[in-house]
Regions:
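Solvent-exposed alpha-helices and their adjacent loops that cap or buttress functional pockets
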Residues: 1-2, 32-33, 81-83, 114-116, ...
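N-terminal beta1-alpha1 cap of cysteine-dependent amidohydrolase-like domains
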Residues: 1-92
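Short glycine-rich anion-binding loops that position phosphate/pyrophosphate groups of nucleotides
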Residues: 13, 93-97, 128
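Class I SAM-dependent methyltransferase SAM-binding "motif I" and its flanking Rossmann-like core
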Residues: 98-169
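Conserved anion/nucleotide-ligand pocket segment
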Residues: 153-154, 158-198
Length: 198
């Protein structure tokens, strides 16, 4: 792997819905250039849903990698050590706002930026896709879609589930018209966008 960070933003779906559909996951692992890369999963946004974690292992134990996951709501291990050992950091979907609040409390945001600058592969689906951008379109609020500030590793805005949820497209267009979000990326479910640092 070249000494440049990678971010793979997945618009929806993935192993959370179908652990047997693994094309994007294989692509992510191949980016490391390693025979058996270490991949760590952060299911924070889903409140660490057990079924989601099971699907993660169903998917990645069938691929040539060493999968693990981290919980932040139980006894939390040393995050710096885990991030240092990881080749791939995979972030699951769920509530983006709550996830980022927890991450910042644990200073995980700073560790992830360091990992990106060291050339590791950062990736994720839905909340795990938009978290890397300056802005993300999220349904973290039950009432309606909102634009929120995210980590800012990548410029502009990102919206997942663009064709999967009927309100996404018109709501995003309305937000753009009203200046509630900037230009950016609308990512369909089952699709991914690859950003290469440098």
């Amino acid at each position: 792997m070249e000494d440049k960070g990678h971010i793979i933003a997945i618009g929806g779906g993935g192993f959370g819905r179908n652990p047997n559909h693994r094309k994007i996951e294989k692509y992510i692992l191949d980016l490391t250039g390693k025979e058996k890369p270490n991949i760590v999963f952060f299911p924070t946004a889903s409140a660490e849903d057990k079924g989601y974690i099971v699907n993660y292992y169903k998917c990645f134990t069938k691929l040539n990698c060493d999968p693990s996951h981290v919980t932040l709501f139980q006894r939390t291990p040393r995050l710096d050590s885990i991030i240092n050992k990881a080749d791939v950091i995979y972030v699951g979907g769920g509530n983006t706002k709550s996830m980022l609040a927890v991450w910042r409390e644990w200073k995980l945001d700073k560790l992830l930026l360091k990992a990106y600058n060291q050339g590791k592969v950062l990736c994720g689906v839905s909340a795990g896709a938009i978290c890397w951008f300056e802005q993300g379109i999220t349904d973290s609020w039950a009432s309606n879609l909102n634009s929120m500030e995210c980590l800012g590793f990548l410029p502009e805005m990102a919206c997942p589930h663009y064709q999967e949820e009927k309100d996404r497209r018109p709501d995003v267009h309305e937000m753009l018209k009203k200046g509630k979000c900037g230009p950016g990326w609308a990512i369909d479910g089952g699709a991914a966008v690859h950003f290469n640092k440098g």
